[in-house]
C-alpha cells in the first residue's frame, strides 16, 4: 500500500483563527442515553479554520462559492518545496532549487513547526510576483503551512487577487512538518458548500509510483 501523509492539522477549540473570526465551537444536541440511541453534536466554525481551500468568493463579490469550484486542481501530482526561514515573503529565489519540471500543484513549507494552537501575525506569505512566476510554469494550485497567502496586515490581498486573475486555487494552514521535499499525489477536496467563501479540507499526500 502506498504511504500517506496527513497534512491537515487537528481542528479543535484550540485551533488558531484570524482575530475576530469564528473559532471552533461544539456542543451536544443529543446524548446517548437509554432514551436516546445516538450522540449528535452541533458545530460552529469559520470555514478558514485548519487546512482549507479558499473560494474566489472570499476575495471577490459575485465570484464562485467553493461548492461551484472545479475539483480537478485539488487532486493530482504535487511538489512540496521547503523554504524554511524565508522571512515574511516567499520569493522565486526560495523555490528555484526545486523548480525544474514543476507539476501543476506546489505546496511550500515555511516553518519548522506549524502554529497548531496559537495565533501569530508573524507568518510567511507568498509575494504576488512569486505566484505569477509559478503560474507561468503551469501551476494551478498553491498551498502553504500558514494562515494566508497574504500577510496578516494586508488590506489589499494582492496575492489573492493574482490567484483570482490567474484562475488558480489555494490551500492554507497545511501541516507540512513531517513532509520531505519531493513529489507526491495531493488529495484535498473541499466540501460542496453552495454559498461558502471557503471549505475545510482533509488534505493528504500519497506517495507516487
Curated annotation (Swiss-Prot):
Binds 2 zinc ions per subunit. Keywords: Hydrolase, Metal-binding, Tryptophan catabolism, Zinc. Pathway: Amino-acid degradation; L-tryptophan degradation via kynurenine pathway; L-kynurenine from L-tryptophan: step 2/2. Zn(2+) 2 binds at residues 54, 160, 172. Its cofactor is Zn(2+). The active site is at residue 58. It comes from the Bacteria. Substrate binds at residue 18. HAMAP family: KynB (MF_01969). This is Kynurenine formamidase. It comes from Bordetella petrii (strain ATCC BAA-461 / DSM 12804 / CCUG 43448). The lineage of its organism: Bacteria, Pseudomonadati, Pseudomonadota, Betaproteobacteria, Burkholderiales.
Amino acid at each position: 500500500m502506498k504511504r500517506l501523509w496527513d497534512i491537515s492539522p487537528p481542528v479543535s477549540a484550540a485551533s488558531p483563527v484570524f482575530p475576530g473570526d469564528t473559532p471552533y465551537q461544539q456542543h451536544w444536541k443529543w446524548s446517548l442515553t437509554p432514551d436516546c440511541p445516538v450522540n449528535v453534536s452541533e458545530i460552529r466554525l469559520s470555514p478558514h479554520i485548519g487546512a482549507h481551500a479558499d473560494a474566489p468568493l472570499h476575495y471577490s463579490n459575485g465570484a464562485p462559492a467553493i461548492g461551484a469550484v472545479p475539483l480537478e486542481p485539488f487532486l493530482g501530482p504535487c511538489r512540496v518545496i521547503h523554504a524554511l526561514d524565508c522571512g515574511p515573503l516567499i520569493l522565486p529565489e526560495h523555490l528555484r532549487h526545486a523548480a525544474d519540471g514543476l507539476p501543476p500543484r506546489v505546496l511550500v513549507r515555511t516553518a519548522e513547526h506549524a502554529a497548531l494552537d496559537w495565533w501569530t501575525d508573524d507568518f510567511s506569505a507568498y509575494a504576488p510576483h512569486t505566484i505569477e512566476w509559478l503560474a507561468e510554469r503551469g501551476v494551478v494550485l498553491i498551498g502553504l503551512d500558514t494562515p494566508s497567502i497574504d500577510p496578516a496586515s494586508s488590506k489589499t490581498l494582492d496575492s489573492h487577487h493574482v490567484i483570482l486573475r490567474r484562475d488558480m486555487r489555494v490551500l492554507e494552514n497545511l501541516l507540512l512538518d513531517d513532509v520531505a521535499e519531493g513529489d507526491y499525489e495531493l488529495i484535498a477536496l473541499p466540501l460542496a458548500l453552495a454559498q461558502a467563501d471557503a471549505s475545510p479540507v482533509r488534505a493528504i499526500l500519497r506517495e507516487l509510483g
